[in-house]
Amino acid sequence: MTGSTPPILPEHPGLNRLLVFLVHLFTASGTFFSLLALVAAIEKHWPQMFGWLAVALFVDGIDGVLARKLRAAETLPRFSGDILDLVVDYLGYVLVPALAIATGAILPPSLEMPAAAAILISSAIYFADRQMKTENWYFRGFPAVWNLVAFYLFLLRPDPRVALAIVVAFVALTFLPVLFIHPLRVKRLRPLNITLASIWSALAILTLVRDFSPPAYVTAILSLIGVYFLLAGLLRPKTSAPA
């Protein structure tokens, strides 16, 4: 949101500040949903865990829109929405999924905790990277969306050695100059990206309802959409800057 955009209620600055603070509270509510997901993970109720992570993901998907609409950084500069977002995201995108990957019979038993440590540490470093995003909203390196990696590992249940290789690959991609697309904010193919993300969300909910035993076609579509978003940053036009 540009500085020339007027506040929502220019004649009521106090109300604007209250609205921004309420948006920050809404963002912070993601910590509670992540806690509920953590409890479910400890109890090994995996569909329930992913369900709460989905609620946290929904909050994360719309709070930024509200904050930009209200010009949160200018209206209430005391509180950093960016820092708050990172705190909330680390819980839901990294900590809870790392626990699930480590305790969900996904990896070779002797390497579960080392893999979880690699996930947690690499993601913490990534979240501290001031250059994690390009000007056009691509992510530099794997953006630590371990909630999605965990979802696919639980859905596909590959051989533990293959699962370990996948985890190692994404940890390595965290630090490599590879671009990953933001499905909502990157302008290129945005209608397609939003459509695919919506289809993915609906099928993911069906998968959770079916306790990770969806019809084969659902698994196939989810996998194809996942591959698309994984490669979308790599397949962007090379003749211009990311768009």
Region roles according to the model:
Residues 1-9, 139-243:
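C-terminal membrane-associated helical module and adjoining short loops/tails
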Residues 10-72:
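Active-site-proximal cofactor/substrate-binding loop regions of enzyme domains
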Residues 23-28, 69-126:
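Multi-pass membrane catalytic core of lipid/isoprenoid biosynthesis enzymes
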Residues 2-14, 62-81, 137-140, 243:
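Cytosolic, membrane-interface loops and tails of multi-pass inner-membrane proteins
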Residues 65-74, 122-137, 175-184, 231-239:
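C-terminal ends of transmembrane helices
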Residues 15-25, 79-87, 132-141, 183-191:
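Short, amphipathic, aromatic/basic-enriched membrane-interface segments that mark the entry/exit
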Residues 36-52, 87, 91, 95-116, ...:
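Helix-coil boundary and interhelical linker segments in multi-pass alpha-helical membrane proteins
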Residues 53-60, 118-126, 170-177, 222-229:
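Alpha-helical transmembrane segments of multi-pass membrane proteins
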